[in-house]
Design a protein with these regions (language model features):
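S-adenosyl-L-methionine-dependent methyltransferase catalytic core, i.e., the SAM/SAH-binding region
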Residues: 1-319
Length: 319
């Protein structure tokens, strides 16, 4: 059994705690528990009497979080699952409504640093990228079984990679001589596909393709859309939803979802009053995303791309 190091610095920690508006004795959910960096600080502020539900689909993360939160075990519930199912998991855990929810989207430090998970283009390892290792389908399955058109679509749409078609073409050609099953083999293909001049622009040439594959393997964008809606449904009026994203695709989904639930009216603009009956569910707290300050950027380079958005439940109407 491989032991992973889950010690990491939680991003935007003080901003997260502030926007959750934590209350002693309150009920809260960390839908992306990870190594419990955020959760360890949340639970300190809600005891005595408070309850924290932590959810993660990574069993190694759950094991690490249990150890980290051992001192608060009477106030913590830990569940294995995908945060898209946050409503059902909360209700199964005895939490019908909660005072706040945190979703910290993206790959955690330990997943990037451990080559056995296949998330990183900086370490050689199996081309996996599954957040939940119970799933049968991984990144190598996509590359070795999908059509050139489908691979192009994934890399273009999820990675926003302008060389997507060329990379896909090289992948199809390479797999004729053998299965593409390691991260460094994919990195080599990407480097050969992207012209030399373009490889010197915008960081590591494999960054966008690896992001695209990770999103596709874990169905991340659809999961996020469902999670925002399901999380909102179990918030008490006045409860806070805080979401941290790490790339523009995720941030746009959160921004759009928040705006749609703040202004759900579908009446024609020429009508003097609303007749559709759709009530706002949320009030957006952060008109612009909160980003890391200079001090955090120096201490934790992975906070550079982090964006935090927060909203408050305003309606008691349930679906």
């Amino acid at each position: 059994m491989v032991t992973l190091n889950f010690e990491h610095i939680p991003v935007l920690l003080s901003e997260t705690l502030e926007h959750l508006d934590l209350k002693q004795g309150g009920y809260y959910i960390d839908g992306t528990l990870g190594g419990a960096g955020h959760s360890a600080e949340i639970v300190k502020r809600i005891i005595p009497g408070g309850v924290l539900l932590g959810i993660d689909q990574d069993r190694d993360a759950i094991n690490a979080a249990k150890k980290r939160l051992e001192a608060y075990k009477d106030n913590v519930i830990i569940a294995h699952g995908n945060f898209r199912d946050i409503k059902a998991i909360a209700q199964d855990s005895g939490l019908k409504e909660v005072d706040g929810i945190l979703l910290d989207i993206g790959v955690s430090s330990h997943q990037l640093d451990e080559n056995i998970r296949g998330f990183s283009y900086m370490h050689d390892g199996p081309l996996d990228m599954r957040m939940d290792t119970d799933c049968d389908y991984d990144a190598s399955d996509i590359l070795n079984n999908s059509s050139e058109r489908e691979i192009t679509r994934i890399i273009r749409d999820y990675g926003e990679e302008k060389w997507a078609a060329r990379i896909a073409k090289f992948i199809i050609e390479e797999r004729k001589s053998g299965r593409i099953d390691t991260t460094f083999k994919l990195v080599d293909i990407i480097k050969r596909a992207i012209p030399a001049a373009a490889r010197r622009e915008g960081g590591h040439p494999a960054k966008r393709t690896f992001q695209a594959l990770r999103i596709a393997v874990n169905d991340e964008l659809e999961v996020l859309e469902q999670a925002v809606r399901n999380a909102t449904e179990i918030l008490k009026p006045g409860g806070r939803l805080v979401i941290i994203t790490f790339h523009s695709l995720e941030d746009r989904i959160v921004k759009r979802a928040f705006n749609n639930m703040e202004r759900p009216c579908t009446c024609p603009p020429q009508l003097p009053v609303c007749v559709c009956g759709k009530e706002p569910l949320l009030k957006v707290i952060t008109k612009k995303p909160v980003t890391a300050g200079e001090e955090e950027l120096k201490a934790n380079t992975r906070s550079k791309s982090a964006k935090l958005r927060a909203a408050e439940r305003v309606s008691s109407k349930r679906s």
